[in-house]
């Protein structure tokens, strides 16, 4: 009889252990079951990001993304993964009004998707919310620096940390949500020296995850479509690890040419009579 091997899915606590052991944390975004299945073996966590609004739906920002959209795609990612921790973004408007609103929506995400954690944007001003959630059994990943849900108040997608006092403010944000119980903090779009100072601060227990920050972070994350060359526009911090857009276009062109010429479908692609 063959032996069934059960893979234990990683949990939030495992990321803290990796930080303590000095092991780099690897993460990517995913929105579909098939891409989630591909990255599952290589990632410690997979983020179902509200960036799906821009990547999947062509939105100008993440602001129109709804909780229902996040739940639907998180369900798909859970079906495609077996090993990686799955973290789901709390979309704009789903947690800011009150701690109670945040808990009800976060609990819904975890119950309806089976995901292992939620992520919310904001620093010290949301520390009480982070504590409220973690005290009630919801693992929380924070997000500081360039927070896309604040694009309108930031005046656009602007790198953080250039101004006087920015390092102190960002460090205070990281400390506050770490002390509130966040197991990890995404640090996005922060100038390198400031990001490095925060990432190497021994008082910050949470694992730091960089995206346009510093190699000193405990781990790194990228949007999968950006690093594969599928996106039209990518930020400076993205390194291209593939050019799938060109390969897809070439395949589609070949298909269209063969259909037009009557070469597809050939005999091998049709069903003969019995």
Curated annotation (Swiss-Prot):
- Enzyme group, top EC level? transferase
Residues where Mg(2+) binds: 50, 89, 121
Catalytic activity reads: 3-methyl-2-oxobutanoate + (6R)-5,10-methylene-5,6,7,8-tetrahydrofolate + H2O = 2-dehydropantoate + (6S)-5,6,7,8-tetrahydrofolate
Q: Report the domain of life of the source organism.
A: Bacteria
Subcellular localization is given as: Cytoplasm
Q: Gene3D superfamilies attached here?
A: Phosphoenolpyruvate-binding domains
**Note on how the cofactor is bound:** Binds 1 Mg(2+) ion per subunit.
> What cofactor(s) does the depicted protein rely on?
Mg(2+)
Q: Which InterPro entries match?
A: Pantoate_hydroxy_MeTrfase, Pyrv/PenolPyrv_kinase-like_dom, Pyrv_kinase-like_dom_sf
Q: Could you tell me the keywords of this UniProt record?
A: Cytoplasm, Magnesium, Metal-binding, Pantothenate biosynthesis, Transferase
User: What Gene Ontology molecular-function terms does this entry list?
Assistant: 3-methyl-2-oxobutanoate hydroxymethyltransferase activity; magnesium ion binding
Q: Which GO terms describe its biological process?
A: pantothenate biosynthetic process
* Residue positions binding 3-methyl-2-oxobutanoate: 50-51, 89, 119
Q: What is its EC number?
A: 2.1.2.11
Gene Ontology cellular component terms for the protein in this record: cytoplasm
**One Pfam family cited in the UniProt record for this chain:** Pantoate_transf
Positions of the catalytic residues? 188
Pathway connected to this protein: Cofactor biosynthesis; (R)-pantothenate biosynthesis; (R)-pantoate from 3-methyl-2-oxobutanoate: step 1/2
Please name the HAMAP family in this protein's record: PanB (MF_00156)
Q: Which NCBIfam families match?
A: panB (TIGR00222), PRK00311.1 (NF001452)
User: What function is annotated for this protein?
Assistant: Catalyzes the reversible reaction in which hydroxymethyl group from 5,10-methylenetetrahydrofolate is transferred onto alpha-ketoisovalerate to form ketopantoate.
Q: What subunit structure does UniProt give?
A: Homodecamer; pentamer of dimers.
Query: By what name is this protein known?
Result: 3-methyl-2-oxobutanoate hydroxymethyltransferase
């Amino acid at each position: 009889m063959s032996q069934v091997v059960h893979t234990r899915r990683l949990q939030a606590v495992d990321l803290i252990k990796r930080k303590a052991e000095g092991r780099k944390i690897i993460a990517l975004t995913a929105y579909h079951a098939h891409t989630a299945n591909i990255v599952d073996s290589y990632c410690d966590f997979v983020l179902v990001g509200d960036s799906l609004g821009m990547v999947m739906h062509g939105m100008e920002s993440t602001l129109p993304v709804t909780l229902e959209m996040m739940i639907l795609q998180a369900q798909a990612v859970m079906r495609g993964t077996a090993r990686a921790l799955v973290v789901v973004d709390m979309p704009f408007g789903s947690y800011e009004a009150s701690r109670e609103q945040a808990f009800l929506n976060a609990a819904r995400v975890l119950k309806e998707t089976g995901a292992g954690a939620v992520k919310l944007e904001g620093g010290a001003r949301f520390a009480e919310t982070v504590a409220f959630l973690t005290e009630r059994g919801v693992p929380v990943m924070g997000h500081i620096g360039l927070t896309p849900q604040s694009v309108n108040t930031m005046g656009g997608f602007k790198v953080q940390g250039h101004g006087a006092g920015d390092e102190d403010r960002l460090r205070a944000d990281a400390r506050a949500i770490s002390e509130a119980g966040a197991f990890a903090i995404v640090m996005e779009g922060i100038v390198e020296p400031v990001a490095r100072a925060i990432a190497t601060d021994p008082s910050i227990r949470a694992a730091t995850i960089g995206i346009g920050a510093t190699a000193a972070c405990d781990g790194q994350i990228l949007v999968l479509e950006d690093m594969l060359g599928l996106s039209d526009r990518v930020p400076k911090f993205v390194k291209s690890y593939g050019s799938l857009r060109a390969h897809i276009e070439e395949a589609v062109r070949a298909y269209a040419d063969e259909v037009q010429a009557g070469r597809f479908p050939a005999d091998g692609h049709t069903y003969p009579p019995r």
